[in-house]
Curated annotation (Swiss-Prot):
Positions annotated to bind ATP: P103, V104, A105, A106, G107, I108, G109, G110, G111, S112, A113
EC number: 2.7.1.148
Keyword Isomerase: no
Organism whose genome encodes this protein: Rhodospirillum rubrum (strain ATCC 11170 / ATH 1.1.1 / DSM 467 / LMG 4362 / NCIMB 8255 / S1)
Protein name, UniProt field: 4-diphosphocytidyl-2-C-methyl-D-erythritol kinase
């Protein structure tokens, strides 16, 4: 990995991993998009987006998982930069660098988080102050998960990702994210899904502890886990391995996979679990970080 030394006038934004603690598929629209009900939080695991003043627009990528991406014109980072510049009437001038650490096509919104971080970074670099509702609308044009990543805090996500409402306050907890380094494209998972649809079951109570949060989550599910496990059976091994770790309160897949998470009450247990897992499954990607909740403030225009 090439070392990156940001210039003094650069802007740096973290693109944190999105974690679906629950995910219910509640319907399918005529255009093929699915309606969801999902409790979304974030993890401290992140990519880093650096924006520097420049003439013209460019993107360089480095980091452990950067080789899995390309910097072509359709990259979500470049699309986000151009959309923001167009919306704000600003020249798209910036030198962008992405330090890519999160796994790709992994169910934790890595690309969407990168796009959202680009919007935040360039708003600061270019001194643009669009209303939040307008920023969220712009984010939705880039992808279904970009608005929630732009908010970056705990929300209940409904519709196709365009209806966001604040989640109830969540307790302190830690997430151990694990990916077996297998990409699972989201369209394949939805295509493989069988059966009917689920009723929405949003979290309305505020759990007093990580244990209480785990119990509340056990009364809910991730409807995409079953089809994802059929596509990539190694997900079953990831879930079994997480569930067997001391202190793991819940093991579940995030999003459309293949990343899974273990929920822990404290950092010591999560760090011990990560160390144990790296000894037994050294080829897997793993990261233990604090659950980022901090109930989001969402404009009424984006609320259900």
């Amino acid at each position: 990995m090439t070392a990156v030394f940001p210039a003094a006038d650069s802007v740096i934004e973290a693109a944190c991993a999105k974690v679906n603690l629950t995910l219910h598929v509640t319907g399918r629209r005529a255009n093929g998009y699915h309606d969801l009900d999902s409790l979304v939080v974030f993890s401290g695991a992140h990519d880093t987006l650096i924006a520097c003043p420049a003439e013209g627009l460019s993107l360089a990528m480095t980091g452990p998982t950067a080789a899995l991406l390309d910097a072509e014109d359709d990259n979500i980072i470049l699309r986000a930069a151009r959309r923001l510049a167009e919306r704000a009437g600003h020249r798209p001038d910036a030198r962008l660098t992405l330090i890519k650490r999160l796994p790709v096509a992994a169910g934790i919104g890595g690309g969407s988080a990168d796009g959202a971080a680009t919007l935040r970074a360039l708003s600061r670099l270019w001194k643009i102050a669009l209303p939040q509702a307008e920023m969220l609308t712009l984010a939705a044009e880039l992808g279904a998960d970009v608005p929630v990543c732009l908010v970056g805090k705990a929300v209940t996500m409904a519709g196709i990702g365009d209806h966001l409402t604040p989640a109830p306050p969540l307790p302190e907890a830690w997430l151990l994210l694990v990916n077996p380094r297998r990409a699972v494209p989201t369209p394949q998972v939805f295509k493989a899904r069988q059966g009917g649809f689920s009723a929405a079951n949003p979290l309305t109570e505020s759990p007093a502890s990580a244990q209480a949060l785990a119990e509340a989550l056990k009364r809910r599910t991730n409807d995409l886990a079953e089809p994802a496990r059929r596509i990539e059976p190694v997900i079953d091994e990831v879930l079994r391995t997480l569930a067997a770790l001391p202190g793991c309160l819940l093991a579940r897949m995030s999003g459309s996979g293949a990343t899974c998470f273990g929920l822990f009450a404290d950092q010591t247990s999560a760090d011990f679990g990560m160390a144990s897992l790296r000894e037994t499954h050294g080829s897997w990607w793993a990261s233990a970080d604090r659950l980022i909740g901090d109930t989001a403030r969402v404009p009424a225009a984006l609320a259900v």
